[in-house]
Amino acid sequence: MENLQANLTLIQQRLAAASDGKYPVPKLIAVTKTHPAEDILPLQNLGVTDIGENKVQEIMEKLPALEKNFRIHLIGRLQSNKVKYIIDHVCLIHSVDRLSLAQEIDRQAQKHNRVMPVLIQVSPCGEAQ
């Protein structure tokens, strides 16, 4: 845990230095994919508020232990048919890579009376992803 605290402090210092006091300090998202909930919970005591998971099934398995303690981000590719499972449980969906997915996110968010923030993935060269 001491190593984790030291690494986290170093990262936070680097983020603060990068913002140089002129910009907001970037939000740190601890990527917790593949780690069990019991290994993730101690991060709360270190001040971590946001975690990233890349699989819907993993989010759903860890949800009972983590949802009240962290803001959960979906990082990585999301299939349209799985949006309904996470729409009420994540704070941000990263890597929206196609219009049909954005439309499904919007459809499911409306059903749950919420607006879902997303990050759009674009290819500057027009390459298929």
Model-based region annotation:
Residues 1-129:
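Conserved alpha/beta-domain cores
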